[in-house]
């Protein structure tokens, strides 16, 4: 995509004139509207800022556009690492939509921030706790109707690599769960930790050793490794993973480090004991480089993966049995949209938000089945941030 370098000042916001996307520093429009489009929700990004970490917040409008929330970015009370984490899920929303959980990779902590009625964030009381290891990179949360919610954190730092569990109360209190820590060997480089839909299975990826952990979760919230876990990946560099929203027994995992043009995605059947078996003739080629992050449409029909080194977003159709068919890839601008990482769909599934960490922006796409169409200007992220993790509410 050819980019023009001319710059104009429009309505107080700096706009880069481009043949395709533009980056806007998003001048403040009146709350509730942006070009006539009403606010329908928010988007949040873990800035992973070195020293005092923050979370950037944006109003999400009906047309997919974003405008900064007043007071953004919001302090987490912990410290970021100031560099890429190579992980998915560094920011999560609680099942009731009232809290955000953010990793503070520089201070080995997890922060809990309460989402106010207008979308702004405030640190919850007692909202910064030890992650139970070194360099937390990913967090997962699942709802439990008869007790406190359950949280697991993946710690990816040498000397303290593990999965550690917590309980999470309705008041936003995160408390360590005794006997929950599952130690990982140094060099595992955890990439993601995630629950299936009912919280009975937890999976984790190891980028450093190209393996996948799979566990059953007992009523007390403790982990029990599946027979054969950890499972050897079907390529090098497992980072992003997602359970199919419509089929809890299907897990999809990216294989990021196979080399130029050799990226793949794997599909696994998850057994009753959380054991993993390959689906079809996987892994499934995406003909791009470094597919790292994964998102699945809410109806379970399509899988999207960001190719960080390309840069592009690939789309697969998912068959009923979990086999994948490559639909195609949507290229991103190598100057403004380099380094795509985490991606998340809007609640209604019609807009896809992609972190382009190398371009320091959020890229927005309209979604029609498996087709992606760029929407307007890119949204700039705070200066000094090293963005990891995105949440759309």
Question: What does each model-identified segment do?
Answer:
Residues 35-38, 76-93, 130-148, 182-201, ...:
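Beta-rich, blade/repeat-based domains predominating
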Residues 48-50, 60, 105-106, 115, ...:
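Short loop/turn segments immediately following the C-termini of beta-strands
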Residues 18-41, 48-49, 222, 369:
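C-terminal region of N-terminal signal peptides and the immediate post-cleavage residues
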């Amino acid at each position: 995509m050819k980019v023009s370098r001319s710059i104009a000042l429009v309505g107080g916001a700096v706009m880069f004139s481009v043949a395709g996307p533009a980056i806007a520093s998003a001048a403040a429009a009146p709350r509730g509207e942006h070009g006539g489009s009403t606010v329908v929700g928010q988007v949040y990004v873990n800035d992973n800022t070195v020293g005092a970490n923050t979370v950037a917040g944006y109003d999400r409008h009906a047309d997919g556009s974003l405008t900064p929330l007043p007071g953004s970015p919001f302090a987490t009370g912990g410290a970021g690492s100031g560099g890429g984490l190579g992980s998915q899920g560094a920011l999560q929303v609680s099942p009731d939509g009232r809290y955000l959980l953010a990793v503070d990779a520089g201070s080995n902590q997890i922060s809990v921030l309460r989402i106010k009625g207008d979308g702004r964030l405030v640190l919850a009381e007692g909202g910064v706790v030890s992650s139970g290891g070194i360099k937390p990179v990913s967090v997962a949360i699942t709802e439990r109707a008869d007790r406190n919610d359950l949280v697991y954190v993946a710690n990816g730092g040498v000397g303290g690599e593990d999965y550690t569990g917590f309980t999470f109360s309705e008041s936003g209190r995160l408390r360590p769960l005794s006997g929950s820590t599952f130690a990982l060997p140094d060099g595992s480089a955890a990439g993601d930790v995630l629950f299936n839909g009912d919280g009975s299975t937890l999976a984790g990826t190891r980028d450093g050793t190209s393996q996948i952990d799979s566990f059953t979760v007992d009523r007390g919230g403790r982990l029990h490794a599946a027979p054969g876990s950890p499972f050897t990946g079907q390529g090098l560099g497992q980072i992003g993973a997602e359970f199919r929203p419509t089929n809890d027994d299907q897990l999809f995992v990216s294989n990021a480090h196979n080399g130029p043009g050799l990226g793949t995605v794997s599909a696994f059947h998850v057994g009753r004991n959380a054991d993993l078996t390959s689906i079809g003739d996987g892994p499934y080629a995406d003909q791009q480089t470094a597919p790292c992050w994964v998102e699945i449409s809410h109806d379970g029909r399509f899988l999207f993966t960001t190719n960080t080194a390309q840069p592009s977003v690939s789309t697969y159709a998912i068959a009923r049995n979990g086999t994948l068919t490559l639909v195609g890839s949507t290229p991103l601008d190598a100057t403004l949209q380099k380094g795509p990482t985490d991606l998340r769909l809007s609640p209604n599934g019609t807009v896809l938000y992609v972190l382009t960490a190398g371009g320091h922006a959020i890229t927005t796409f309209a979604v029609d089945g498996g087709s992606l169409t760029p929407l307007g200007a890119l949204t700039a992220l705070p200066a000094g941030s090293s963005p990891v993790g995105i949440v759309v509410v």
